[in-house]
């Protein structure tokens, strides 16, 4: 009897973990989609642009920098400042084109 109760609790815990995991995953995906409507099918571009913000955050260690860089699907002034700080200004035309693709549908 005790073994059956323990099994029941184990099964319930597994289901709880699965449900919470799915909810968190869907919320994260929804945030990325709302912030950058063109990200679907363009994950590689999104990764390249996101990398600039992550590198900038790693240099300055300020969460406001990371949030500001990503704001408006990378259309913020902070993103340009991060490109400058990462010494990637010569790549700005490429990033501008990629950000335009990620912002498609706005």
From Swiss-Prot:
Residues 105-106 form a propeptide. One of its GO terms (cellular component) is extracellular region. Residues 1-29 form the signal peptide. Coiled coil: none annotated. The modification Alanine amide is found at residue 104. Transmembrane segments: none annotated. This is Molt-inhibiting hormone. It comes from Faxonius limosus (Spinycheek crayfish).
